[in-house]
Amino acid sequence: MFKKTLSMICCVIFLQGCSQEQEVKKELTNMETALLAATEKNETNTVISLLKQGANINATDSQGRTPLMIATYKNDIKTAKALIDAGADVNIQDNIKNNPFLYAGAEGYLDILKLTIDAGADPALTNRYGGTALIPASEHGYITVIKELLTRTNIDVNHVNNLGWTALMEAIVLSNGDETQQQVIRLLIEHGADVNIPDNDGVTPLEHARAHNFEEIEKILVEGRK
């Protein structure tokens, strides 16, 4: 009888423990959901409050986005800073291989880019096209972003993406050849861009520039070959 009673008591204690553990997990899950929702709504103070309560700062939604990734997509500098200051991982990539550093570089979000660099962003990580942050930044002519990447990180200026394009190549092929793009080309060359790296079809940057009638860029490339 005693053994039976003791066994029943142990079972009750075990079940209570399991129930408490489930409640804790449920509470943490609810906080994660609330954290992601608060970030989506740009509610910085709520985000900070939830983090203080123990919400997982690197929780992800169905798209693999962390709170910091969501804040970056929205260019919410205040919330992004709060999350980074609290220790958010800046290198986590979502389901489409974006992370805060890569996306900020691609979209020209200089403030968030600086925050991610300060927090130890890995410049070698690549997006779904196999490109570094420098490649789309060069395509779009984001001069300040390009300078930030070239001077504050060890990003590979000659990295080749899945299309066979370097930052220099993309700055020619996908641009209109205006003064901004000419400045981009000069910057890249000044920081070691190889003007002779061809694309997957064996076409060089100079040949692309000529095909687009980008005379000024052609001159810059010829000078860069010396």
Please describe what each predicted stretch is:
Residues 37-42, 70-76, 103-109, 136-142, ...:
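Ankyrin repeat A-helix N-terminal signature
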